[in-house]
Amino acid sequence: MPGDMGPPKQGGTRYGSISSPPSPGPQQAPPGGTYLSEKIPIPDTESGAFSLRKLWAFTGPGFLMSIAFLDPGNIESDLQAGAVAGFKLLWVLLWATVLGLLCQRLAARLGVVTGKDLGEVCHLYYPKVPRILLWLTIELAIVGSDMQEVIGTAIAFSLLSAGRIPLWGGVLITIVDTFFFLFLDNYGLRKLEAFFGFLITIMALTFGYEYVVARPAQGALLQGLFLPSCAGCGQPELLQAVGIVGAIIMPHNIYLHSSLVKSREVDRSRRADIREANMYFLIEATIALSVSFLINLFVMAVFGQAFYKQTNQAAFNICANSSLHDYATIFPRNNLTVAVDIYQGGVILGCLFGPAALYIWAVGLLAAGQSSTMTGTYAGQFVMEGFLKLRWSRFARVLLTRSCAILPTVLVAVFRDLRDLSGLNDLLNVLQSLLLPFAVLPILTFTSMPAVMQEFANGLVSKVISSSIMVLVCAVNLYFVISYVPSLPHPDYFSLVALLAAAYLGLTTYLVWTCLITQGATLLAHSSHQRFLYGLPEEDQENGRTSG
């Protein structure tokens, strides 16, 4: 990208763009790359005209990104929201998906315009301590997401085997399937993207089948989708709303998408090509997230219809009088509202609509868990390489992430019961929401910087919308923490929560400060933080890192 965005000499320091020098034609990925080892060429077509051939060439990164909108954590969140609030939170699902699309649009633009992913840009701009803390929070989000994939896959195996495979056995099986995907990765980028497209299709068909047989009330569904209200809602519904946001807009997915778009050959010396790539990636992401929204809608609507205000005794009676009567004992015989999870959800569908519904549910759940496995591996590797400039093999990276995910999960599976495992899934959704500022604030910061994005920097409308998203997320998270802390079981937990809250608020405050600089608060830019106004000092560009 031509042009130095810095001001005249200030104390001997020059500032400018971080974009790597553009070079027409094929761009080779660095040695040791994974997804980026292969570049997809973009066909030449008439300039300015929409082309399906070009759209097909750009198709891939958006659908891989959309898998994070369909992992077992989302499925758990959907069915819990339906069971707890009926159709009342469908509008939260809709707008969370829209906000997710806006965040992913910014991530894709950053990758296309600069040729760098979000982790790499964070490495260049943030000082060492905030940078390391930021990296740790994203790694925590990745491990949390991987735990959800392990839980979902283990429960799917248990359902498909009629309980013959114990939960801990299903957890251990996930070690094997991970390495199967590493093997599949060797067959080429387009084949890998096609395979994940196949898994998304399986989810659409299986959960769509459940929607058809459940026949939700369409009038109430449309009202819940387009009228933003929640009459009679309390803390349980709030927890589900936070869980929906955390499950839909996942922190590591923003880092992932900014790197995935680099797999397409885009001549960044031509601004028309950059503008065109941004357009096609936005169209692809919109299509992909529309599909993911429909799948999530299917699940939430099915359980809003079948489970809302259902009692344990009613669920017991339904199963006791069905061909799956052996499963009836998983529901206590009392009049409390049933607390459904992804295991009980499959069972009650089978009791209501026949065994086929149970097995079809399990297949969809298995596809959700499997499809998320490889994208989590890619996200972990891109984040590690971007923040730390540390290159690990795919095998080593997936071994680290999956080991961190499996150890606590298998302990819960062995020593606790299924309800604890599903409860862990719910808490992981809330964790994703709490960690969301550590992805949204950096992407908003860097896409608002003319020194980084040149003429493609966020305009006023985009800044206002993105900032509103951030304020909303922070407000919901703060309200959740204030509501949750009094329910802690022991006073000793308060000191731990206070310590974590101090670190959380400290890092968030720093990220907000740097973000405000890029939004026009120039008085906050002191010393080395002038880079957030003018770009990276030239000596730091040459060294490829920040000082400190």
UniProtKB/Swiss-Prot annotation:
Membrane topology (Extracellular): 74-82, 161-164, 215-237, 305-346, 416-426, 486-493
Catalytic activity: Zn(2+)(in) + H(+)(out) = Zn(2+)(out) + H(+)(in); Fe(2+)(in) + H(+)(out) = Fe(2+)(out) + H(+)(in); Mn(2+)(in) + H(+)(out) = Mn(2+)(out) + H(+)(in)
An example Gene Ontology CC term for this record: phagocytic vesicle membrane
Keywords: Endosome, Glycoprotein, Ion transport, Iron, Iron transport, Lysosome, Membrane, Transmembrane, Transmembrane helix, Transport
Pfam (any one): Nramp
Function, in words: Macrophage-specific antiporter that fluxes metal ions in either direction against a proton gradient. Localized to late endosomal lysosomal membranes, delivers bivalent cations from the cytosol into these acidic compartments where they may directly affect antimicrobial activity. Involved in iron metabolism and host natural resistance to infection with intracellular parasites.
Similarity section: Belongs to the NRAMP family.
HAMAP family: NRAMP
NCBIfam families: nramp (TIGR01197), Nramp_1 (NF037982)
Annotated protein name in UniProt: Natural resistance-associated macrophage protein 1
Species assigned in the record: Cervus elaphus
This protein's encoding gene: SLC11A1
